[in-house]
């Protein structure tokens, strides 16, 4: 069934928080970050029947890629109907929806623009705060959004230290797209690069303050024409991960399993136990 309570944008990443709010993005250079608060958050059958749509705004919303304190600016009412001034759109089937992109470009309802936001992941910290991670492909960044403190920070960027060199990672980090979280709460950043040169990076944020101390190259995919997507850690075995090999030149799409030897005293797939993973991915995807 078509439900139009959520604003019309170029949808990509989605993430639910512990209160069953749905976070979503507009996958565009200049796209914003949104939240949907269902009027019936605990009822699956009516969840998308109506709710409030809001856009993330830092300051007055006029500064792109901004960090710091943010607020949620509502542009629909609790039923999902457009607030005064919001832009609506009617599709060929006569379904009327709120145009999230056009609406949140308006001064009164403006959201902060980010550059091609893609995947979303969410994690709960030890203190109960939830942090939403957003990859922005064009600016080569990942942002962390603390939903309890209403603060957005740059989690990783080209200024983040490369653990292998002790220097800023620079353009070795290109096109962050997918995100994944392992059993220990570590964040992995998957690049979208052409020509089979995409890396998967392991981000170290030891104190969980929302800013990574370093990045380490975890795996590299050399399959011509392909990009890695959908990195996922096995819920039953924290030392097993899966990654898709998408649109290779050969035309043979694959799902690759990566198995690692865990470090003593850990349950997650830590870097020292992953020496040779890049080669494993290369061999299995050729």
Located regions from the model:
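Sequence/structural signature of beta-propeller domains
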Residues: 1-260
């Amino acid at each position: 069934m078509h439900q139009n309570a959520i604003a019309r944008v170029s949808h990509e990443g989605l993430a639910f928080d512990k209160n069953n709010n749905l976070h979503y993005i507009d996958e565009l250079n200049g796209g914003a970050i949104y939240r949907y608060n269902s009027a019936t958050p605990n009822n699956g059958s009516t969840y998308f029947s109506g709710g409030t749509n809001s856009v993330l705004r830092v300051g007055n919303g006029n500064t792109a890629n901004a960090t710091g304190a943010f607020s949620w600016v509502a542009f629909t009412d609790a039923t999902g109907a457009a607030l005064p001034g919001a832009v609506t759109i009617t599709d060929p089937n006569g379904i009327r929806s709120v145009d999230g992109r056009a609406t949140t470009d308006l001064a009164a309802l403006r959201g902060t623009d980010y550059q091609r936001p893609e995947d979303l992941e969410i994690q709960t910290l030890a203190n109960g705060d939830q942090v939403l991670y957003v990859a922005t492909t064009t600016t080569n960044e990942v942002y962390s959004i603390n939903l309890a403190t209403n603060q957005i920070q740059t989690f990783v960027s080209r200024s983040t230290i490369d653990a292998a060199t002790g220097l800023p990672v620079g353009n070795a980090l290109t096109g962050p797209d997918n995100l994944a979280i392992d059993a220990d709460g570590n964040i992995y950043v998957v690049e979208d690069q052409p020509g089979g040169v995409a890396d998967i990076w392991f981000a170290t944020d030891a104190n969980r303050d929302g800013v990574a101390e370093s990045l380490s190259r975890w795996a590299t995919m050399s399959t011509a024409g392909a990009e890695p997507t959908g990195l996922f850690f096995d819920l039953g075995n924290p030392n097993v991960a899966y990654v898709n090999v998408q649109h290779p030149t050969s035309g043979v799409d694959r799902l690759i399993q990566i198995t690692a030897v865990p470090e003593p005293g850990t349950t997650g797939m830590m870097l020292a136990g992953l020496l040779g993973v890049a080669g494993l991915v290369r061999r299995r995807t050729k």
